[in-house]
């Protein structure tokens, strides 16, 4: 049972680092990519609107399709996140494409949260004693500490380091 708690703690810890790279540094990364403050505001607003409109549908996918598991949905989301962030990092794109890709990053990354809660409920159904509060607390700590450390990394290096932190934390999350 302790193994499941450690696994769940790690999932929460790493997810919130990934979330910090996308949400916590949205303005810095998008300014680095040439967007204005107004355009960044549009991106964040549209990301929130898309989340409101689509997150319930995405979190319901495993209920609609028998062979689709929450884990598979998360993997699919992360494939899109990898592709979107990689395109933003490696390719010089028109502003509108940068905006669309970052909107996808924002709303898709939030679609993972219901699945993280579902994992805890599934573990409890299996008879495991999962301390959800501890795991979420570690997630909050990881968000705060990664935000703090990335601030220094961005200052010492450049905003593209945000992508590298995203890739590393995402790969560890998926494993």
Predicted regions and their residues:
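Structural signature of the two symmetry-related core transmembrane helices
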Residues: 71-87, 167
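Hydrophobic core of transmembrane alpha-helices in multi-pass small-molecule transporters
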Residues: 13, 84-85, 95-115, 119
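Paired intracellular helix-loop junctions of major facilitator superfamily
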Residues: 120-131
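Small-residue (Gly/Pro/Ala) motifs that create kinks and tight helix-helix packing interfaces
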Residues: 27, 58, 145-154
């Amino acid at each position: 049972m302790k193994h499941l708690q450690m696994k769940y703690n790690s999932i929460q810890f790493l997810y919130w680092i990934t979330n910090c790279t996308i949400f916590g540094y949205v303005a810095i990364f998008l300014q680095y990519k040439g967007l204005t403050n107004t355009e960044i505001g549009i991106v964040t607003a549209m990301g929130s609107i898309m989340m409101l409109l689509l997150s319930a549908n995405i979190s319901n996918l495993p209920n609609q399709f028998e062979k689709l598991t929450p884990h598979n949905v998360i993997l699919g989301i992360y494939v899109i996140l990898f592709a979107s962030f990689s395109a933003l990092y490696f390719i010089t794109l028109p502003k509108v494409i940068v905006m669309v890709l970052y909107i996808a990053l924002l709303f898709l990354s939030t679609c993972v949260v219901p699945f993280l809660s579902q994992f805890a409920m599934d573990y409890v159904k299996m008879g495991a004693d999962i301390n959800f509060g501890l795991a979420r607390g570690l997630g909050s700590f990881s968000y705060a500490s990664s935000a703090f450390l990335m601030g220094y990394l961005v200052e010492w290096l450049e905003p593209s380091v945000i992508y590298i932190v995203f890739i590393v934390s995402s790969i560890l999350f998926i494993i």
